[in-house]
Design a protein with these regions (language model features):
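Conserved ABC ATPase "signature" region
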Residues: 96, 100, 107-125
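Conserved ABC ATPase signature
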Residues: 129-133
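Conserved catalytic motifs of ABC-family nucleotide-binding domains
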Residues: 150
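ABC transporter nucleotide-binding domain
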Residues: 170-247
Length: 280
């Protein structure tokens, strides 16, 4: 279990993360959803001890996480947004190097590499040099590298950033399969459809603060599962209703170009935070 208590990070007079409180249960897939600059990466950086908090603390199974907390740190791995690998290495060499950092035996490294590459669909590419990989393959390799030491917690910072639609959906399939590995996962993203498709719960973050934390379905139900859209003065106006019947009744009162549709997580975010995030 991860407990984030009063977590704050300041850079001079600028507060990047502002008194966050959150509990992530064991084996939960948690999404941290917000626009660029909202504080997502700063939060991940503190959880990976790259940055130290100005205030507050992070607990991993009750143990405070810091740069000296060896037991807690061994429980987690991070997949950063940047491609943090030597470009002249082969994929097999990347995995071997990671294994040696953790004093794994050669036989163990080889077996684990084979298992993870099969899991990620990379089995036939082990001898390919990193610089020749697509962005999607690099991210898959980074996930395999992060899983090399069998962590209990996986931190994923914008894992589909820069991918085209097909590559993103393929990555989603891989991320869904991580649920079968008994991992606690924290995913940061600015793609609303990604959070809705993958996460058990989502936390909206904006300006370094949490706005709301709940399941995607519960958030949609709170706003109203049915929406009616109408274009007024070249602006899309949306209204939300608790039942389909109520939405249809409103629809009858509007011009013919009004549209009935299902409410999405994006609608919830726009209503709560006031930002229009990137559509998938």
């Amino acid at each position: 279990m991860i407990e984030i208590r009063n977590l704050t990070k300041k850079f001079g007079d600028f507060t990047a993360v502002d008194h966050l409180n959150l509990t992530i249960e064991t084996n939960e897939f948690m999404g941290l959803l917000g626009p660029n600059g909202a504080g997502k990466t700063t939060t991940i950086s503190m959880m990976s001890t790259v940055l130290l908090p100005t205030e507050g603390e992070i607990l991993i199974d009750g143990e405070q996480l810091n740069r000296k907390a060896a037991t807690a740190k061994r429980k987690l791995s991070v997949v950063t947004q940047e491609f943090s690998m030597r470009q002249d290495m082969t994929m097999n060499e990347v995995m071997e190097y990671q294994g040696r950092l953790y004093y794994m035996r050669k036989k163990e490294i080889r077996a684990k590499t084979e298992e993870l590459f099969e899991f990620a669909g990379l089995s036939q590419f082990g001898h390919r040099v990193v610089r020749h990989l697509s962005g999607g393959m690099k991210r898959k390799l980074m996930i395999c590298r992060a899983l090399m030491t069998e962590p209990q917690i996986l931190l994923l910072d914008e894992p589909t950033a820069g991918m085209d639609a097909l590559a993103r959906r393929q990555m989603w399939d891989l991320l869904r399969s991580l649920k079968d590995r008994n991992l606690t996962i924290l995913l940061t993203t600015h793609f609303i459809d990604e959070a809705q498709a993958l996460c058990n719960r989502v936390a909206f973050i904006d300006g370094g603060k949490f706005d709301v934390v709940d399941t995607p379905l519960a958030l949609i139900e709170q706003l109203g599962p049915f929406a009616v859209d109408i274009l007024q003065d070249n602006k899309l106006q949306s209204s939300y209703f608790p039942t389909r019947e109520a939405a249809i009744e409103r629809l009858r009162e509007l011009p013919d170009d009004a549209v009935l549709r299902a409410t999405t997580l994006e609608d919830v975010f726009v209503e709560r935070v006031g930002h229009r995030l990137t559509r998938g």
